[in-house]
């Protein structure tokens, strides 16, 4: 394959390049915008490639922030200076949101979450501070000529994630790069062309994973989210565990590794089962996180049902080792594995973990709600215990979560999670569970077609009740409204009945 030597720079960006050149300054496109263009591959007849339209673009320059602002203003619809102290000015230029940063070096001192920034005047020095060779490729914003001092194009072609220079130094400069390495390996990999870190980069990460403690929750969350939403999320999660990074992101997840399950229901341990569920659910942010957390409560609720080999008495114990029967003193052996209440324990763990990573409250509530309810669909058995219409209405209503006008979670999301969970079940049980799932889904769809079950409420509001009973405000109102709402859900009271 011919090596790409030049990019076709779109008009808005090339005009910026021209403005900077006329003012005596350099302007180079850098980072993801160049990497993505190079990954598209060269044209058939020429070693050139067009930049994709309508995307964000990063650029680097020898101009300092005040000069950048002056040069941007004639071309920008909007201009932002939030990152000015780090040398970055952002602007909306045509279809692009451009971030232009002064050539610089930056380093995070141990224990600090803020980099020490020094401005420079040399492109190659600026590229040398970048994390990986695939991100250390620049293209002249005016001519499109590529500058590649660290052979990033070659590594893109080979599918290699390689640090620029010494991997230990690059990770020390900014420990978030350890998560970024996993993210790039995960998101860039395709079936026909996988990406992999170099052994020395993996070693630097594995030996220094604890450096992540100095990184803010928000920055860790952004990288974790990108890994989790990737089509190769399971590979990324495995790598986070293998390289020792997961303890600094979601440490509770490490507890799922090698936790056995009842073979009749699950043929994989909790960790492997979780990966199957994550890969089986669509890449929607709330659903992916619900899949990731859905069984995280199992390790802390693990119990073994023992049976006495002499008198047959049953007992529940935390250990799989043989024990002594409390009734007759005989020997007990483990027969079954249980995780009673793991959904509620898991919901609490998910809430704490997401709060620790500074997720928005709505996201935290939605995910913990889905985790807490993820066992509900298993209470429905098509062949022996199908629910009444009232029970299905209650299921729909109970699994609905909203804040104001914003819907956070609903029965559709829960059923998608349940369907993915079934995919990770043992083959024989899977067939039975799939039949019940289809039957429940059909009943849910049928009932929702008749009415907006999620919005069913008491036909009488607080004012109606105070007027009818001649009483003032108090707790009695909520109790009575809940009772009336329940009657509506059960079907014994119409949603518009006022009498």
PLM regions: where:
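Catalytic cores of the polymerase beta-like nucleotidyltransferase superfamily
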Residues: 1-499
């Amino acid at each position: 394959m011919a090596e790409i030597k030049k990019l076709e720079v779109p008009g808005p960006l090339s005009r910026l390049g021209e403005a900077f050149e006329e003012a005596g300054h350099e302007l180079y496109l850098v980072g993801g915008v160049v990497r993505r263009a190079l990954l598209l591959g060269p044209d058939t007849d020429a070693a050139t490639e067009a930049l994709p339209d309508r995307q964000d673009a990063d650029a680097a320059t020898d101009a300092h922030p005040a000069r950048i602002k002056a040069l941007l203003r004639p071309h920008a619809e909007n201009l932002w200076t939030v990152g000015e102290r780090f040398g970055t000015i952002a602007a909306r230029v045509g279809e692009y949101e451009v971030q232009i940063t002064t050539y610089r070096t930056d380093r995070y001192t141990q224990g600090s979450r803020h980099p020490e920034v020094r401005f420079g005047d040399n492109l190659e020095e600026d590229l040398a501070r970048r994390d990986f060779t695939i991100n250390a490729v620049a293209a002249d914003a005016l001519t499109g000529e590529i500058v590649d001092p660290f052979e990033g194009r070659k590594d893109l072609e080979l599918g290699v994630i390689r640090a620029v220079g010494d991997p230990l130094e690059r990770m020390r400069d900014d420990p978030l790069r350890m998560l970024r390495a996993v993210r790039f390996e995960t998101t860039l990999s395709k079936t026909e062309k996988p990406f992999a870190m170099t052994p020395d980069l993996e070693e630097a990460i594995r030996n220094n994973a604890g450096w992540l403690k100095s990184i803010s929750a928000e920055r860790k969350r952004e990288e974790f989210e990108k890994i989790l939403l990737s089509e190769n999320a399971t590979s990324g999660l495995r790598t986070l565990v293998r390289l020792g990074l997961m303890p600094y992101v979601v440490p509770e997840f490490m507890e799922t590794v090698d936790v056995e399950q009842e073979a009749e229901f699950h043929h994989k341990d909790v960790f492997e089962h979780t990966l199957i569920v994550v890969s089986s659910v669509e890449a929607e942010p709330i659903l992916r996180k619900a899949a990731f957390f859905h069984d995280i409560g199992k390790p802390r609720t693990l119990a073994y049902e023992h049976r006495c080999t002499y008198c047959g008495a049953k007992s529940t114990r935390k250990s799989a080792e043989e024990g002594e029967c409390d009734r007759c003193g005989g020997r007990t052996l483990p027969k079954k594995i249980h995780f009673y209440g793991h959904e509620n324990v898991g919901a609490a763990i998910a809430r704490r973990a997401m709060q620790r990573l500074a997720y928005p409250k709505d996201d935290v509530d939605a995910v913990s709600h889905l985790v807490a309810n993820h066992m509900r669909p298993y209470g429905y058995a098509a062949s022996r215990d199908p629910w009444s219409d009232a029970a299905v209405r209650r299921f729909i209503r109970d699994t609905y979560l909203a804040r104001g006008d914003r819907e956070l979670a609903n029965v559709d999301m829960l059923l998608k999670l349940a369907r993915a969970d079934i995919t990770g079940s043992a083959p024989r049980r899977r067939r039975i569970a799939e039949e019940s799932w289809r039957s429940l889904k059909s009943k849910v769809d049928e009932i929702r077609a008749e009415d907006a079950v999620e919005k069913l409420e008491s036909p009488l509001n607080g004012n109606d009740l105070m007027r009818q009973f001649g009483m003032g405000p108090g707790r009695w109102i909520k109790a009575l409204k809940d009772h009336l709402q329940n009657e509506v859900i059960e079907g014994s009271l119409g949603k518009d009945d006022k009498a």
